[in-house]
């Protein structure tokens, strides 16, 4: 069954979950469990819709033990990172595993990096998918039109916070703290730069380069795309093509720039995928690149690395 952790759950409740399903294949059978961390406005399962659409099931069918986590849909990367750390501790306690392989999408990049920095002895790898290592100029623009203390900022904070709480409610995690201003600050280029100073592990020291492959025993990886209109049938393509204008012609996926997504070993950062394609949304309608296969291949990469 799907293993979902909404906030820090009691270990006794987790133990009551059914035993892991024995998978038919072993291609993705990593030594350590794979733990998925969602991005901004994210969820695990909400109203029957998986954030990691088709990804968890494919990994399991190829032998992986996969856990999806649920942190605040809207909050600072530090708050979300600490929530993730607590859930990792629970997963380790229940499974008996010594470490986990973390994969974070979008703002989940900062969540997994926080966890890897705080508990490196319990993290085998940290992988960023379409991650906000360098922040986003889209967040810069929003912050610019709604400066702190302004009426616009008050309204925007209320709207973003309210949406986050609604997502948390529908995903079965009501009561998680929400802070629109905090998340906006985290995702601006200046906010990301500050986060990088505090958590530099795996961050490239030269723009557009790769970062350190291993820091404190944790392996760092990343991949992302530069696609926009990747499928005419995917309605999310069109707003992402609009937000892409914020990048002034630089390669991007609609929300994150190509170079700003780099972390550790860059597997590839120019897939024909946009920001939502990399989690196989909306509902598996993507272009010529299969995003599900990328996760399967990465699990095999981790397996072959002894992770």
Predicted feature locations:
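Sec/Tat signal peptide C-region and signal peptidase I cleavage site
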Residues: 19-23
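Bacterial N-terminal signal peptides
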Residues: 9-16
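Active-site catalytic motif of lipid deacylating hydrolases and related acyltransferases
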Residues: 25-100, 148-156
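Active-site-proximal beta-strand/loop segments in catalytic clefts of secreted hydrolases
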Residues: 37-40, 69-74, 105-106, 128-132, ...
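Serine-hydrolase catalytic core
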Residues: 173-231
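Bacterial N-terminal signal peptides that target proteins for export
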Residues: 1-8
